[in-house]
């Protein structure tokens, strides 16, 4: 992989800057935007970026840091899903707590925001409390967002219980946007000043990158990633007025800044040290870029990937038509097209050939996979296995220099699995999934040295790019994700079935 980002330089610069900021206060509430762990978007657009950079940064500061996790009650009620992992936000909170503990980081508590006694939320609270995790319930803030006098009073932030903390840096994070991180920080700020403590607020958000140009593909890729939130990158006019310097921020932060500044000034009783929303941030990611051209190309590929993702989400009914069109428009404005993703044309051309050969209207799934050396392989779905499984087998054969004619998995292993699916479990689709084929391959590897060699090549697939001519099942997507393969899909279902396509 060509590197465009210096991870070590970034970690050094970022930790130094956070410590400089905390020196001004007894306690700093640091709102962490984006993903704390497994930031796959940042990894894709900044080749060389460590997907767990933020948590490694916190680990470096662990003696000074404790963590509060926010979760909006409404997201629990409607089972909101974290797209990159296919798990609900409440389950992601449990995963996040485990991961943070794995890095020796102290999780102070979980805050349920905009709580109003929702039944599913109460069950989740019980689950946490019975495992020894502190939970705080914050109701919707009275007067928010415009009535500053009510917000900063005992009727507003004062109604929220105060979260007891002991360390100088309190990181406030969440599974996703709209979880109430900012409100939790400001509520704590209110309580700190009522207690005579000097506390501060800052924001750590990786994107948009304030010190790269507005129309840089890196910042446009952020717009593409948040197309459902309707985020738009803008020049921070407050920053320009204060310092006569251009900085990039996004519409929500710029629009909310005047009110946010007034709230902070009302809480502290003095003029805010922040002249702009950019001032509030502590992000130094732009200083880690070492090859701008590599970052630009990676960001363009991400814009195409996001357009495919949004098209599939529209087909599934997850996003509206406006979101779908906006993702496509962003791609076109950058003079990009779907076919600029190298794996798209080989997959579509092979699928068209198969359709012509079969002389049927049925769709056949073809998956194209680009390997690290630039080789593009394809795999097709059959009665025996899915296209995802076929292309993975072809890839490990390629890396192991195994002839295409050699079967890696014995029919003695395959037939009982297919019979189990069809006859015992009553499955409508007996073709083996990618995960099932990999399990079968691992069984064969115990007695077949060739299969064992092929198994050893699976780690080489990490970072590869793939494209499917049909929408993959959640299970198939997750298997590719575990292998470290970035996959896109054409927004077409494999059949007319409504339930059996999921």
Curated annotation (Swiss-Prot):
It comes from the Bacteria. InterPro entries: DUF1846 (IPR014999), DUF1846_C (IPR048441), DUF1846_N (IPR048496). Disulfide bonds: none annotated. Belongs to the UPF0371 family. NCBIfam families: PRK13663.1. This is UPF0371 protein CLM_0396. The lineage of its organism: Bacteria, Bacillati, Bacillota, Clostridia, Eubacteriales.
């Amino acid at each position: 992989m060509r590197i465009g980002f210096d991870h070590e330089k970034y970690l050094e610069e970022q930790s130094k800057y956070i410590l400089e900021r905390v020196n001004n206060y007894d306690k700093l509430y640091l709102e962490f935007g984006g993903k704390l762990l497994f930031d796959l978007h940042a990894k894709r657009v900044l080749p060389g970026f460590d997907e767990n950079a933020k948590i490694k940064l916190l680990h470096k500061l662990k003696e000074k840091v404790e963590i509060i996790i926010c979760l909006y009650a409404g997201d629990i009620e409607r089972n909101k899903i974290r797209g990159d992992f296919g798990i609900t936000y409440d389950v992601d909170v449990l995963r996040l707590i485990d991961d943070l503990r794995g890095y020796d980081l102290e999780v102070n508590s979980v805050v349920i925001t905009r709580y109003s006694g929702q039944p599913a939320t109460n069950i989740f609270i019980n689950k946490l409390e019975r495992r020894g995790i502190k939970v705080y319930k914050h109701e919707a803030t009275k007067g928010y967002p415009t009535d500053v006098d009510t917000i900063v009073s005992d009727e507003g932030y004062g109604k929220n219980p105060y979260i007891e903390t002991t360390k100088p840096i309190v990181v406030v994070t969440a599974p996703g946007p709209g979880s109430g991180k900012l409100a939790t920080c400001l509520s704590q700020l209110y309580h700190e000043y009522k207690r005579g403590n000097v506390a501060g607020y800052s924001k750590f958000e990786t994107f948009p990158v304030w010190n790269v140009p507005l129309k840089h593909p890196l910042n446009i890729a952020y717009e593409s990633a948040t197309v459902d939130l309707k985020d738009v990158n803008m020049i921070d006019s407050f920053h320009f007025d204060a310092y006569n310097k251009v900085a990039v921020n996004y519409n929500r932060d710029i629009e909310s800044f005047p009110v946010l500044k007034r709230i902070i000034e009302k809480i502290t009783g003095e003029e805010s040290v922040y002249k702009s929303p950019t001032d509030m941030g502590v992000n130094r990611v732009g200083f880690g870029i070492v090859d701008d051209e590599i970052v630009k190309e990676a960001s363009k590929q991400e814009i195409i990937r996001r357009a495919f993702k949004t098209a599939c989400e529209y087909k599934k009914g997850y996003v509206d038509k406006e979101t779908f069109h906006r993702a496509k428009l962003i791609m076109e404005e950058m003079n990009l097209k779907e076919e600029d993703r190298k794996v798209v044309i080989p997959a579509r051309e092979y699928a068209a050939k198969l359709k012509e050969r079969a002389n049927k209207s049925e769709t056949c799934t073809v998956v194209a996979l680009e390997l690290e050396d630039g080789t593009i392989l394809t795999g097709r779905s059959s009665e025996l296995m899915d296209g995802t499984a076929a292309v993975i087998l072809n890839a490990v054969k390629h890396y192991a220099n195994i002839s295409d004619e050699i079967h890696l998995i014995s029919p003695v292993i395959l037939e009982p699995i297919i019979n189990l699916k069809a006859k015992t479990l009553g499955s409508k689709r007996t073709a083996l999934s990618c995960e099932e084929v990999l399990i079968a391959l691992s069984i064969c590897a115990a007695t077949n040295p060739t299969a064992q060699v092929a198994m050893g090549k699976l780690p080489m697939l990490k970072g590869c790019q793939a494209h499917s001519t049909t929408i993959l099942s959640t299970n198939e997507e997750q298997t590719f994700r575990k292998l470290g393969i970035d996959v896109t899909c054409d927004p077409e279902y494999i059949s007319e079935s409504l339930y059996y396509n999921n």
